[in-house]
Every structure is written in structure tokens, then in C-alpha cells.
Amino acid sequence: MHHMTLAEIARGLADKKFSSEELTKTLLARIAEHDPKVNSFISLTEELALSQAKAADARRANGEQGALLGAPIAHKDLFCTQGIRTSCGSKMLDNFKAPYDATVVSKLAAAGAVTLGKTNMDEFAMGSANESSYYGAVKNPWNLDHVPGGSSGGSAAAVAARFLPAATATDTGGSIRQPAAFTNLTGLKPTYGRVSRWGMIAYASSLDQGGPLARTAEDCAILLQGMAGFDKQDSTSIDEPVPDYSASLNTSIKGLRIGVPKEYFSAGLDPRIAELVHNSVKTLEGLGAVIKEISLPNNQHAIPAYYVIAPAEASSNLSRFDGVRFGYRCENPKDLTDLYKRSRGEGFGAEVQRRIMVGAYALSAGYYDAYYLKAQKIRRLIKNDFMAAFEEVDVILGPTTPNPAWKIGAKTGDPIAEYLEDLYTITANLAGLPGLSMPAGFVDGLPVGVQLLAPYFQEGRLLNVAHQYQLNTDWHTRTPTGF
């Protein structure tokens, strides 16, 4: 049962081939057996999962249907879950049990999804490798010596290892799409405001967005259907009707205009990945898509702009974790200053501390105009580039990452090298656009992803293109050895 996709599970449950309780027990046993070598979970919720599975089976017995009813999932450990530890991968929140459910959690629970647990992540979602977690690094199921990507590495590794068919994740600068690329999954970052951020512990509030990680575009459509929608509790949520994402999957892409930015194929891109991207372009062209070279001239400025804006917002968001209001409190402080200093120094890891300091510096008097304001101006230019491009094309295609997954520890001493891995993903966050990564091949046995970007609220278009691609390729069906 563990090899089934979310769509296959939905059909199996509807046809009464197995029960949600049977499936849940099977997957929990599989996690117990195999996760010690992957480290994809921070917390397992066996008791909750079994009670939700029994309830889902009872709802089906009463005639209720639904693609998520009885389907097992997991939540990235920054979505608040009532009475269950929500750690953000940090010592700072190691003993925090949320008093309420995040909107994403409550919506999926109402749809009948079964929560198997909370997945590992980079501390406070800051990282591209899932090495900064207080609970240890996550291993890539395709090669346990390599990273799974971050910050949603736990969700990605759990799905890739066939512990469950799909999981929630978040994306601030590529944290859904990059792990999807590194673990041979399909991952979708929705339009900013499409999925509620209420109860989702913030890293950078103007960039964060929740979304699905799964093996196929079809599964992403199912999970996104349960996550998306307006939420009056989230001031950044946008009141836009949610379409039926599964309904448009089988639409022909003949005549669809796909733009390929020339700036994406620079010296920093692994030539083997470039070849796989070109192969995917040929596949889509063979399906009737029209390919056009485009330009995104300000793409080169994206990384410095992002690594001013995101840390600036993080330094503000994380100021509440001080040992007094929220979070870990040090023992036997000498005075109030010592309490603040030691609680934050001991509670936050090195990467979080680095980004807080960078952000505080960028917002400080004398540097605000030179750094933060200039970064926001670049953000506007990047958005303008996309708006101009979407006058000419319907979808933009390029590599998800410049390199395949690296070995664990290879970049820990060089944060800039890790930041540069976000080159192709962060622009979608800066502009608020939807983006999707889909499997496109392998380099040295490690998965490679291709990224698709679309105009605002065109998630259905991305899922349609990805589904048509997956009907004509088999990369997404490959399974890591040993899983």
C-alpha cells in the first residue's frame, strides 16, 4: 500500500479495497522501521492518526466521499497543531504545544485527512539543506549521504521514502520546490495569499506560503484543493474563488506559450541539469506547446535582495522569542539582560542567529535606505520583469536548482554557497507568483527538477502542464533503492 499515490489511495478507499485504519497502521509501522535512517519526522501522532482514520472510515460507511477522506498526510512542524508539539525545528520551541490548529491543519482535518505526524525542517525554515534542525539533519532517501533540500526536507524525505503519499510544506524562497527537485517529487508554491498563513509560524511574512509536496501533479491538485481558500483570520489571505484543480489536469497544452529565460542558463548552472531542462522543453514542445526565449534582466539581483528582505522580516518576527513572552528560557539568569541574551543565544541555532543579525543590521539607522529600501526597489523590478514576460507567454520554464543535492556537511561552513542554490526559486517569492517543480531526470543517481512559473492564481495551469508532462514521462514513478 505504501507505493500508492494520493489519487490511488482515494480510489482504493472509495472501492473499499482497504480501510483508512488498515492503511494508517501499515504506514505507521513502515515509519517506525525506516525513519531512523532518514530522520524525516520530529513527532509521530499515532494515537491521533488512528482515531482520525477510524472516524474517516465511519464517515465513508455513512456514504460520505472525498479525495482526502481517510488519506494519510503529515504536516511540516511549523503548522500549529493543538496539543501537539510544534517546534519549528528549534530548541527555542522544543516544548511548545500549540493551543490551536493552523487553518491549513483544520481545513485538512475537516476534509478527513489523517495526520501521521510533524515533519523535520530547517530551524524556523531558514535553510536549503535541512541541516540546521535542532533534531538533526534529514537524509535524502535517494542517497543517505546527501541532503534532501530545505527547509521542508522532512516532508520531502517522508514522501520520497514512501512513508506517506503527500505532506504539507512551506516556501519562503524555494522551500517546497527545491526539496521536491532533490527528492524526485512534485511540489507547488501557490500564489501569495492563496493558502492561509494563520497558525503557520512565520519566517518572512511577505514571502511565506504553504503548499503541497507529493509525487505527482495529480496528488498536488488534491492536497492543494484542501489547503486553498480565503481566511478572514489571515490579513494577507486573498478572497479569490478556488477552482477545481483536478478538473483542468487533462486539458491539452497545444498552443500554450512557454517562455525559457536566457538568464537561467548562466555559468552557475550544472550543464547536465541544463541538458535535462532542454529535454523537458522538447517533451512539452512535442505535446504542442510553443517555446519562446524570454528575458528576466533583474534575475541576477534576486539573491542579494532576498537575503536582505527575508532576514529583515525574520529579525522582527523572531523578536518575540526572548525567554519572557515565548520560547526557551535559560536557567539561573543573573539579570534581565542576561535572560534575554542567554535565552536567545542558547535557544536559536547558528543559522537563525546569523539571519537575525543580518536583518537587524539591514533595518538599522543609517543602513535602512542603503540596504532594505534598495532591496524592496529591486523586488519591484523583478515583479515588473515577470509582468512583462507574462504578456508574451503563459508559463515560464527553467531549472529548479543550479546543482543536484550535495553531500551532508559540504556547505555548512559556507553559507553563501548554500544561499546561491536558491537562485531560480526566490524570484517567485519576491513577486508572489505560483511556482511548481516536477521531476525531470537524474544526475549521478540524484533527482533533478524543472520549475514552472505562472501568473497570479494560475496554479491550475501549472498543475495542468505538469500532469501532461507526467503522462508522457516516467521520472516521477522512480523509487529510491531500499524504500
UniProtKB/Swiss-Prot annotation:
GO terms for biological process: translation. InterPro entries: Amidase (IPR000120), Amidase_CS (IPR020556), Amidase_dom (IPR023631), AS_sf (IPR036928), GatA (IPR004412). The keyword Cytoplasm does not apply. It catalyses: L-glutamyl-tRNA(Gln) + L-glutamine + ATP + H2O = L-glutaminyl-tRNA(Gln) + L-glutamate + ADP + phosphate + H(+). Keywords: ATP-binding, Ligase, Nucleotide-binding, Protein biosynthesis. The active site is at 76 (charge relay system), 151 (charge relay system), 175 (acyl-ester intermediate). Coiled coil: none annotated. One of its GO terms (molecular function) is glutaminyl-tRNA synthase (glutamine-hydrolyzing) activity. One of its GO terms (cellular component) is glutamyl-tRNA(Gln) amidotransferase complex. It comes from the Bacteria. It holds the Pfam family Amidase. Its EC number is 6.3.5.7. Allows the formation of correctly charged Gln-tRNA(Gln) through the transamidation of misacylated Glu-tRNA(Gln) in organisms which lack glutaminyl-tRNA synthetase. The reaction takes place in the presence of glutamine and ATP through an activated gamma-phospho-Glu-tRNA(Gln). Belongs to the amidase family. GatA subfamily. Heterotrimer of A, B and C subunits. This is Glutamyl-tRNA(Gln) amidotransferase subunit A. It comes from Pseudomonas fluorescens (strain SBW25).
